[in-house]
Amino acid sequence: RDQPRSRGLGDVYKRQNLYRDEMAVHLIDQIDYDFSQVEKKSHGLMQRFGSLEVAMRQNDLAWEVQNYLADHPDAVVVNLGCGLDSTGRACDNGSCKIYNLDFPDVIAVRNQLLPAGDREENISCNLNDTEWFTKIDASEGAIFFASGVFYYFLTEQVRTLVQAMADSFPGGVLVFDAANRTAVKMIAKTWLRSAKIQDVGAYFAVSDAKSEISPWDSRL
């Protein structure tokens, strides 16, 4: 999942006027870590491209959430694989409920740096263990979003999760980003190198969402 890496990354967003993440700048000031090496790498072509791609992605996701809340103001906003992302807060309309989901160690850090606010809950879980479904009250509607998350999932894991969500949250909306097979191979060799992904071909990739994902389930 893509998290703020350095103040330089935030500066790229600001210079391009694409995405202003003041929370990212605030968090970097709170984290006791030397970002100098990351800062040096942030000026490379791939890193600059990645920064702009992330900025556009966050804009797109925020638009989808805000658009859904315009019609369902009391709905829940669920950030799948949240890391230290604050998109839910950025889209808060004053009446929605925000859930942030991630692994226990990630949520432990989040609770320190981004304690849950009003109408917000941080949930420790494995997204593939659908026990977390029981903690989401979707009676007023639900929009789920996954930002830079499904790159780490096998295609079958995404399919199983999506079908299970369709069963448990009828009428809900799921928004996520994805890349085609060629791009996933490139990402695995660069940004996801630390994940030690071996069989890239088994991981989630999409070239044509309508023709590839729609057949998974008639409700999609």
Language-model segments: which ranges?
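Short alpha-helix
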Residues: 200-220
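Single conserved hydrophobic/aromatic residue that forms the stacking wall/gate
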Residues: 2-13
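Conserved beta-strand signature within the Rossmann-like core of class I S-adenosyl-L-methionine
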Residues: 168-181
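A short, conserved alpha-helix within the catalytic core of class I
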Residues: 152-165
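Short, glycine-/aromatic-enriched active-site segment of Class I SAM-dependent methyltransferases
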Residues: 185-200
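A conserved beta-strand element that flanks and buttresses the S-adenosyl-L-methionine
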Residues: 144-145
